[in-house]
């Protein structure tokens, strides 16, 4: 990771999946059958009803309630003992054990059983909710095909594990099946369902020679793919790894609740002890039973699980909702960060535009005799060494005129190609030294271009040959269809300012900004210039919110690292950019940035609401219990009810997709 990356990657692995107060909820991946979890509660409930309605042992009224207590009480007694043995005395199990034993001691047998019964019911539903949220997050594992069909040189088919397929192998994918590994499409143009990766419902057409990502579904026909990279480095595996890691990267709210619970639990136990002891002592040793009962009510309602379960559950839910839309947050902390965004900065090419350039006009300088077609071929020979969209367009244009590697008679090969970062390339072609790129590249080598403009095309590639200006190539690029809507949605969400940073010429960037409704633009920027502009923007809005940068992953890693929240657009972006980014948008739809902000804001609002709701109800019942206005029944129902209500609230998080 870039050492300039100021983002906080807070990991917290203690009490994973539990409360932080010692509340280790049982939502392992291999959950027990439902009947096994419900049976002890059903037995306890039946015996409790028998004890209340028609106790068969009037001489020993406590006996039936002890029997009712055991099915739900023994597991909690065991958990309490295990936590105490680990040195964690102040945990929710200790609270429940103290409260119920105290209730038995003062003869409140039905309440003692009811406390653990309702507590167990609440735990059951909380565990199921957490388990469901975890399954949502881990559902991408189901996208992984179990086998791949490898085609050998003789055309024979062999079913093997995707992990066993080697780079260069040819695999076959049947219609309706998922592509198991990243590769190059060998079949003619085919359609693929990419919804599982990008969240986009529209099928995507891919041409022969273009890349196909693992996890896509072939539509309508059998296709063959040449494997580009091993399974461990495939797009699907990268997505699964990011989503699984996100579940363990805690938000600030989650870590605060964990720390709060560690202090809160011993404090409420101490307060309960004071309620039980101080008033009777001040009254001359009378009223012990009354004040002990009030202390027990205080203990029961004080259990912090409504907070310590619902808060991480809300972040699990937010990450899960986003992942189904092809928006991959690398942790709950970034849900918080996007909720506080006030400025969004975009790269231009490949992010707000399609990045699919088309060569429009090739112009030779006066006195250059090689001709436009030959100049294009020579420039393409150098540009073959680059992966930039402009370079690919020039190569494609030259190839369409017969300059292909398969046509050795007409193909040109460049030697000694070197990149001058942010400016272009230099190399030797057919004995000529070529400089290819921005006008600034040629000017840096003492060549005057005159910055000749043309009315066609948005982007200019200048060429110098043997120390002289040779000509230029004009290329056109189009805004993405969703870009204007994406900018409009950001403004509607209250984003104060949008901005474009680009290395393209001013006229092209200004035209795009005006077309899309972007507030601010900066052009002719080198990579370090983008970083400087990002620093300036962050300083300007330091007191008003956070700044996001959205890039397609090509040469964007430094500015992604400088931003408060980095969005990598398109899951096929560079590894460095995807590694540096905090949020990866699998599709090329800029409107997904607005969706991410909506999910982040709804998650944050829900967390705040749940915290206020839980604390408000608990404090009210604590005071009522201490003053004698709340019973153990009220305490346990309030505790269980608020916990389940907070859990249910987490399912209010929706995508807000438009």
Residue ranges and their predicted role:
Residues 1-32:
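Histidine-centered metal-binding segments
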Residues 28-43, 264:
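N-terminal membrane topogenic signal
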Residues 43-46, 255-284, 297-315, 608-637:
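Bilayer-spanning, highly hydrophobic alpha-helical transmembrane segments
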Residues 51, 55, 59-147, 151, ...:
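Actuator/coupling domain of P-type ATPases
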Residues 93, 97, 146, 197, ...:
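Conserved catalytic phosphorylation-site environment of P-type ATPases
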Residues 359-497, 506, 515-534:
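P-type ATPase nucleotide-binding
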Residues 431, 465-609:
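Conserved ATP-binding TGD loop and adjacent catalytic N/P-domain core of P-type ATPases
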Residues 541-544, 581, 586-658:
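Membrane-embedded transport module
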């Amino acid at each position: 990771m870039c050492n300039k990356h100021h983002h906080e990657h807070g990991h917290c692995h203690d009490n994973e999946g539990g409360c932080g107060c010692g509340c280790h909820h049982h939502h392992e991946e291999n959950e027990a059958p439902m009947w096994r979890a419900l049976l002890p509660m059903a037995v306890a409930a039946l015996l409790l009803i028998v004890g209340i309605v028609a106790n068969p042992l009037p001489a020993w009224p406590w006996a039936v309630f002890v029997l009712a207590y055991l099915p739900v009480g023994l597991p909690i007694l065991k958990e309490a003992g295990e936590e105490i043995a680990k040195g964690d005395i102040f945990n929710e199990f200790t609270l429940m054990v103290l409260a119920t034993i105290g209730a038995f001691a003062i003869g409140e047998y039905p309440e003692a059983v009811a406390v653990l019964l309702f507590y167990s019911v609440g735990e059951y539903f909380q565990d199921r909710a957490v388990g469901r949220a975890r399954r949502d997050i881990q559902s991408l594992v189901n996208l992984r095909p179990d086998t791949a069909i490898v085609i050998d040189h003789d055309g024979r088919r062999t079913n093997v594990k995707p992990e066993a397929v080697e780079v260069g192998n040819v695999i076959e994918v049947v219609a309706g099946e998922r592509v198991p590994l990243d590769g190059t499409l060998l079949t003619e143009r085919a359609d693929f369902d990419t919804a599982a990766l990008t969240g986009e419902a529209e099928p995507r057409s891919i041409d022969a020679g273009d890349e196909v990502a693992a996890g896509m579904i072939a539509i309508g026909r059998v296709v063959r793919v040449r494997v580009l990279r091993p399974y461990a480095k495939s797009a699907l595996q990268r997505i699964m790894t990011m989503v699984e890691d996100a579940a363990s990267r805690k938000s600030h709210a989650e870590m605060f609740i964990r720390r709060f619970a560690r202090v809160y639990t011993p404090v409420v136990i101490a307060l309960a002890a004071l309620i039980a002891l101080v008033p009777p002592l001040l009254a001359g040793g009378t009223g012990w039973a009354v004040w002990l009962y009030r202390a027990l009510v205080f203990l029961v309602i004080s259990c912090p699980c409504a907070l310590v379960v619902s808060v991480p559950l809300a972040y699990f839910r937010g990450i899960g909702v986003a992942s189904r839309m092809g928006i991959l947050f690398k942790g709950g902390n970034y849900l918080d960060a996007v909720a506080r965004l006030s400025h969004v900065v975009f790269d231009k090419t490949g992010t707000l535009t399609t990045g699919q350039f088309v060569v429009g006009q090739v112009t030779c300088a006066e006195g250059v005799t090689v001709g436009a077609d030959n100049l294009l071929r020579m420039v393409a020979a150098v540009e073959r060494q680059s992966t930039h969209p402009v370079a690919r367009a020039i190569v494609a244009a030259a190839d369409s005129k017969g300059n292909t590697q398969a046509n050795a008679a007409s193909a040109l090969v460049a030697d000694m190609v070197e990149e001058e970062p942010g400016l272009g390339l230099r190399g030797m072609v057919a004995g000529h030294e070529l400089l290819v790129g921005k006008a600034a590249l040629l000017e840096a080598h003492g060549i005057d271009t005159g910055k000749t403009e043309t009315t066609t095309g948005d982007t200019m590639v200048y060429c110098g040959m043997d120390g002289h200006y040779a000509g230029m190539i004009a290329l056109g690029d189009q805004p993405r269809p969703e870009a204007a809507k994406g900018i409009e949605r950001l403004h509607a969400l209250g984003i104060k300012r949008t901005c474009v940073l680009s290395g393209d010429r001013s006229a092209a960037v200004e035209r795009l900004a005006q077309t899309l409704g972007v507030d601010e633009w900066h052009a002719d920027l080198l990579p370090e210039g983008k970083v400087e502009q990002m620093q300036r923007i962050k300083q300007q809005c330091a007191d008003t919110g956070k700044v996001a940068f959205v890039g397609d992953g090509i040469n964007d890693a430094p500015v992604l690292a400088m931003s408060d929240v980095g969005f990598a657009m398109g899951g096929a972006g560079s590894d460095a950019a995807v590694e540096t980014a905090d949020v990866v948008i699998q599709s090329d739809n800029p409107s997904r940035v607005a969706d991410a902000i909506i999910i982040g804001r709804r998650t944050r609002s829900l967390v705040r609401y749940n915290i206020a709701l839980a604390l408000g109800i608990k404090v009210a019942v604590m005071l009522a219990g201490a003053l004698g206005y709340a019973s153990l029944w009220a305490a346990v129902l309030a505790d269980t009810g608020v916990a389940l209500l907070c859990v249910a609230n987490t399912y209010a998080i929706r995508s807000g997709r438009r």
